[in-house]
Regions:
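Positively charged n-region of N-terminal signal peptides that target proteins for export
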Residues: 1-7
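Sec/Tat signal peptide C-region and signal peptidase I cleavage site
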Residues: 28-31
Length: 447
C-alpha cells in the first residue's frame, strides 16, 4: 500500500563552472584533426530537491525516472509520474518490483511510493521469480498513455544460500519488456481532511496500469538476449517509437540497434530496425539513450572502457561510433555507467559521471553528476560548459533519468546507492540515501 505524502526538502542551488571560460572549443575528429567549433552556450540555473530519504542497511531506492503527463488546462503545471525500484543491500542487481510516485503540483508534494501488483514480481515457476528492472517511463501523446520500458529478469528460487539472490542465466535471461499506464483511469476520492488517500490511490493505480508484456523482436540468434534498460527513446510525430535496443547472441558481446515500433495504446509491435552498432571491447555496448535535436538523432552508449556517441538523419541508421571526448581532444573519462540527454531548443546537453573529479573513492566514479553542452556537429563535450549538477557526497549516483518537464524546466532524477562496502565512508561525506530531483531551469523558454 502507499506511503504518506512526501514534502520536498530544498537542498541546494548550484551553478558551478568546472573550468575557465573559453572563446571557442576545439574538437578532435575521428581523423585526429582539430576543428574550431563556435558553440553558443545555453544559460540555466540548477536547484536540487530531496523527494525521499531512506538511510537503512537492508535496501535502498534506485533508478528513479520521471515521465510527464500534460495538463491541458495548465500547461506549466503537468502531472509527473516517477518510477523507481528497491535494491537489496549487498546484492548485485537484485531489484524489487517497480514502484510509482506522483506529483500534481510541480514537485511540491509527492504521493507514494506505491507498488501495484501489475508492476510487481511474479512467480514464473517453482524455480524462477520474474521481474522487470531498469525502468524508464515516457509519455506517448498520440494515445494519451505512459509507456514504461525495462528489462525482464529471472531470479533463482532454488539458490543454495537462501539469504542471497542471483539472476538465472538460462532460458533467455534478459528480455525487453513494457507496461502501459492510462492516466484517465487513475482517479480517486480524497478523504476528508487529507490531500491524498493511500488506499483509494492504490486501487485507482491498479485500474490504470496494464502489466508487463514482453517486447516481441525478430526471431534471430543475435536477439537471444535483449534489453531496453535505462534507455531514453523517442516518439515520432506520427506516433511511431524509435527505441535503442541492446542485444546479443548466447554468450556474446552486446550490440545496439535502434528499432521502430507501432503503439496503439495497448501493445507495441515491431516495424523495422536500422544498422547494428558494435565495439570489440569488454561486454560490448549497453544502456543506449536516444534523443532528437533540431531534426537529427543522437545516440549515447555505455561501455566498461569509455562511453560512445554517434548520430543519424533518420533515427535508425547511424554513423560510426566514436569515444566521448572534450572539445580539447581529451577523453571525457566516462565509463562503466550510463549517460543521458537533455535538449533545449538552442542546445544539446549530456548528463554523465566521469573520472578525474577527485572521486577515485566513489565506486566506478559515479559521483558527482555532471551536465555539459554538446557540440552536435563534432560530437564532443564543450569543456567550458561543464557544471556539477549534483555534488559528490560519497555514494554512487550512476543510475539516473533525464526528462523535459515544461518549456522552462527539465529534471534529472537519481538516488544515492548506499551499499554496505562503503556505507560508513559515504555517510561521513554526507550521503544519506536520498532521492534527488535536480531542476535544470532554463534562462529562456525551451520552445
Amino acid at each position: 500500500m502507499g506511503h504518506l505524502v512526501i514534502r520536498i526538502l530544498h537542498l541546494v542551488v548550484l551553478v558551478m563552472p568546472m573550468t575557465a571560460t573559453l572563446v571557442v572549443g576545439i574538437c578532435a575528429t575521428a581523423a585526429a584533426q582539430q576543428v574550431v567549433s563556435k558553440l553558443d552556450p545555453v544559460g540555466f540555473e540548477v536547484k536540487v530537491d530531496v523527494v525521499w530519504q531512506r538511510d537503512k542497511e537492508d535496501w535502498c531506492w534506485i533508478h528513479p525516472r520521471a515521465a510527464v503527463i500534460p495538463n491541458a488546462d495548465e500547461p506549466s503545471n503537468p502531472k509527473v509520474l516517477m518510477t523507481l525500484g528497491r535494491e537489496v543491500m549487498g546484492e548485485s542487481d537484485f531489484f524489487s518490483g517497480t514502484y510509482v510516485m506522483q506529483t500534481a503540483d510541480h514537485g511540491k508534494l509527492w504521493a507514494g511510493p506505491d507498488l501495484f501488483p501489475q508492476l510487481d514480481w511474479w512467480k514464473e515457476s517453482d524455480e524462477a521469480l520474474g521481474g522487470v528492472i531498469d525502468v524508464t517511463p515516457g509519455w506517448h501523446p498520440q494515445t494519451g498513455k505512459v509507456l514504461a520500458m525495462g528489462i525482464r529478469v529471472r531470479y533463482d528460487l532454488n539458490r543454495e544460500n537462501p539469504d542471497r539472490f542471483s539472476q538465472l542465466q538460462d532460458k533467455r535471461p534478459r528480455l525487453a519488456a513494457y507496461a502501459v499506464y492510462d492516466p484517465k483511469s487513475d482517479h480517486w476520492k480524497k478523504p476528508r481532511g487529507s490531500s491524498y488517500g493511500a488506499a483509494s490511490r492504490w486501487l485507482a493505480g491498479c485500474r490504470a496500469w496494464r502489466g508487463w508484456q514482453i517486447l516481441e523482436l525478430p526471431e534471430e540468434e543475435k536477439y537471444f538476449r535483449n534489453a531496453v534498460g535505462s534507455t531514453q527513446w523517442v516518439v515520432k510525430p506520427d506516433g511511431d517509437l524509435l527505441v535503442p535496443v541492446a542485444h546479443s547472441k548466447p554468450g556474446g558481446l552486446w550490440s545496439v540497434t535502434v528499432m521502430q515500433f507501432k503503439f496503439d495504446g495497448e501493445e507495441m509491435r515491431y516495424a523495422g530496425h536500422g544498422n547494428e552498432l558494435r565495439v570489440p571491447a569488454p561486454r560490448g555496448l549497453i544502456e543506449p539513450s536516444l534523443i532528437e535535436f533540431q531534426g537529427r538523432y543522437y545516440l549515447t552508449l555505455r561501455n566498461p572502457v569509455t562511453g560512445y556517441v554517434t548520430s543519424s538523419d533518420d533515427g535508425l541508421h547511424f554513423g560510426p561510433i566514436k569515444p566521448w571526448k572534450f572539445d580539447d581532444g581529451a577523453e571525457l573519462g566516462n565509463s562503466k555507467t550510463q549517460q543521458h540527454w537533455l535538449a533545449h531548443a538552442r542546445g544539446l546537453f549530456l548528463v554523465y559521471t566521469r573520472r578525474g573529479a577527485n572521486n577515485d573513492h566513489v565506486v566506478r566514479h559515479r559521483a558527482p553528476l555532471f551536465i555539459a553542452q554538446v557540440d552536435p556537429a563534432q560530437l564532443c563535450v564543450a569543456r567550458r560548459t561543464e557544471r556539477i549538477l549534483i555534488p559528490n557526497h560519497g555514494a554512487p549516483m550512476g543510475n539516473f533519468g533525464a526528462t523535459q518537464i515544461t518549456e522552462n524546466e527539465s529534471w534529472v532524477t537519481v538516488s544515492e546507492l548506499m551499499w554496505p562496502t562503503y556505507l560508513a565512508k559515504a555517510r561521513k561525506q554526507g550521503a544519506a540515501g536520498r532521492t534527488f530531483v535536480a531542476r535544470v531551469m532554463w534562462a529562456e523558454p525551451n520552445r
